[in-house]
Amino acid sequence: MINRISGAVIVILLLVGGFMLYSQDSRETMKNETVRLVTDSAGRQVSIPAHPKKVVALNASSIDLYVSAGGSLAGRAATETLPPDVKAAVQQVPTVGLTPNPDLEKIVAMKPDLVLAANIPYHHALVPVLEKAGIPILLQTMDNYQQILDTLRFYGELTGQTDKAASQIAQIEKQYQTAVQNTAGKPAPKVLVLWGTTESFSMALSSSFTGDLVKRLGGINVSDQADKNGAMAGYVPLSLEFVAKASPEVILFITHSSDDKVEEKFKNELAGHPAWQGSLAVRQNRVHKLPYQLFAVNPGTQVGKAMEVLSGLLYSSEAK
C-alpha cells in the first residue's frame, strides 16, 4: 500500500532530512591552541584539531560546505549531488565509498585527522574502529536552514578562512531575504510536501528540512495536523483520508532518486484516486516535482536557491 513506510525508507529520510548540525561545547587551550573540544549531534564530546590538515567527508553536505568554506579534502564520499564548482574542485579527491556504505578500511588507511560524518546508523558504526585508530569523527545532523549557516561558520573556523565562510553566508542570506520578500502581502497557501520512493510515500512535517523552508516562507504545512503515529525523521506515513480532508492548495513532490519510476507511480496515483482528484492542488494544476539536486539531499550552499524555487511555486497561482 502507498502509505506504508519501510525501514529502508526511514534510513533514506535520515539521510535527506538531514545531514549536519554543529554544536560547539567549549574550546581547549592545548598545545598552543591546536585542539578544540566540540559536541557533535550524537552528544559525543570530541577533541579535534583546531585547523585539521587531512579531512575526509562522508556525505554531500559535508563536502559542499567544507570546500565552500575554503577547505580541501583528503577523501570524500562518491556523490554527484554537488554544486558544479564544488564538484569540479573535488573531482580528483579519492573516494571512500558511498554515503550509506563508506569503506572503513580506506578511511583508516588515509590516516585523516578529522572525519566529517552524518548522524546516521551507517556512520555510527564507524566510531569504535576510528576511535581505536585515534581518528576523530564528528556525527552531524542538519535539519533546517539555520543549521546550514552555523555549519558554514564552524567550517570557516576549521579552515582558517572565516571571511570566505562569511561571504558564503551573506550570499545565502541575501537569496533568503529575496525569497521571503516575494511572499509579502500574499495569502499563505496550504501546502502538502510528499517524499516518494517506488515502495511508499510519506508526508513531510515542518521539522523536516523542506518543511522548515516552507514554514519560513509562510506556507501552512497541512501535514503538521496529521496523525503522528509512525512519525520518524520529520515525516509521517501518507494518509489519503487526511489528504482528502486537508485539501492542500499546493502539492510539492520529492523523489528519493532521479529514477522516473517514482514520478510515474505518483502520477498514476493522482489520476486514479478520488482523494487526490478532490484536492484544490490537483484541480488547479498546482502539483510540482521539486528539483532533485536541491531537495532530495540537503542543498548545502544552494539553500538560498532552494528558497527561491519554493517561493515561486508556493505563491504563483499560474498552472504549471
Where are these regions (language model features)?
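Extracytoplasmic ligand-binding site segments that recognize negatively charged/polar headgroups
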Residues: 122-126, 138-154, 188-213, 259-261
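Bacterial Sec-exported substrate-binding components of ABC uptake systems
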Residues: 2-61, 162-194, 255, 309-320
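A short, structured surface patch at a secondary-structure boundary
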Residues: 59-110, 114-119, 222
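Proline-aspartate-enriched helix->loop->beta-strand connector
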Residues: 96, 104-117, 135, 239-253
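His/Asp/Glu-enriched short active-site or ligand-binding loop at hydrolase and phosphoryl-transfer sites
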Residues: 84, 211-232
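Short secondary-structure boundary segments
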Residues: 59, 119-120, 250, 254-258
